[in-house]
């Protein structure tokens, strides 16, 4: 529960003070080559969620 509360506070802080962006921070210069990978990473769990439905469709939703 404290983790959810602290995350909520962080989100509200990023809304109130948009100059310090929490979700859209830039990577350090040395890791700039990984920018395309980092942009796609939040979508990866959705692929697993969709894979569960495809798998169930393949086995006729047993």
Swiss-Prot record:
Question: Where does it mainly reside?
Answer: plastid
Bilayer disposition of the protein? Single-pass membrane protein
TM region positions: 33-53
Q: Which GO terms describe its biological process?
A: photosynthesis
Keywords assigned by UniProt, alphabetized: Chloroplast, Membrane, Photosynthesis, Photosystem II, Plastid, Reaction center, Thylakoid, Transmembrane, Transmembrane helix
Any Gene Ontology CC annotation: photosystem II reaction center
Q: Where in the cell is it found?
A: Plastid, Chloroplast thylakoid membrane
Q: Has keyword Cytoplasm?
A: no
Q: Which residues form the propeptide?
A: 1-25
Give the InterPro entries listed for this entry: PSII_PsbK, PSII_PsbK_sf
Q: Which cysteine pairs are covalently linked by disulfides here? A: none
- SUPFAM superfamilies assigned: Photosystem II reaction center protein K, PsbK (SSF161037)
Q: Does the keyword Thylakoid apply?
A: yes
The entry assigns this protein to a family as follows: Belongs to the PsbK family.
Query: What binding partners and quaternary form does the record give?
Result: PSII is composed of 1 copy each of membrane proteins PsbA, PsbB, PsbC, PsbD, PsbE, PsbF, PsbH, PsbI, PsbJ, PsbK, PsbL, PsbM, PsbT, PsbX, PsbY, PsbZ, Psb30/Ycf12, at least 3 peripheral proteins of the oxygen-evolving complex and a large number of cofactors. It forms dimeric complexes.
What is the role of the protein in this entry?
A: One of the components of the core complex of photosystem II (PSII). PSII is a light-driven water:plastoquinone oxidoreductase that uses light energy to abstract electrons from H(2)O, generating O(2) and a proton gradient subsequently used for ATP formation. It consists of a core antenna complex that captures photons, and an electron transfer chain that converts photonic excitation into a charge separation.
What name does UniProt use for this protein? Photosystem II reaction center protein K
Protein source organism: Agrostis stolonifera (Creeping bentgrass)
């Amino acid at each position: 529960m404290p983790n959810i509360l602290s995350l909520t506070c962080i989100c509200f802080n990023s809304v109130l003070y948009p100059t310090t962006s929490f979700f859209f921070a830039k990577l350090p210069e040395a890791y700039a080559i990984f920018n395309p990978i980092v942009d796609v990473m939040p979508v990866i769990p959705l692929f697993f969620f969709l894979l569960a439905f495809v798998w169930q469709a393949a086995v006729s939703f047993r």
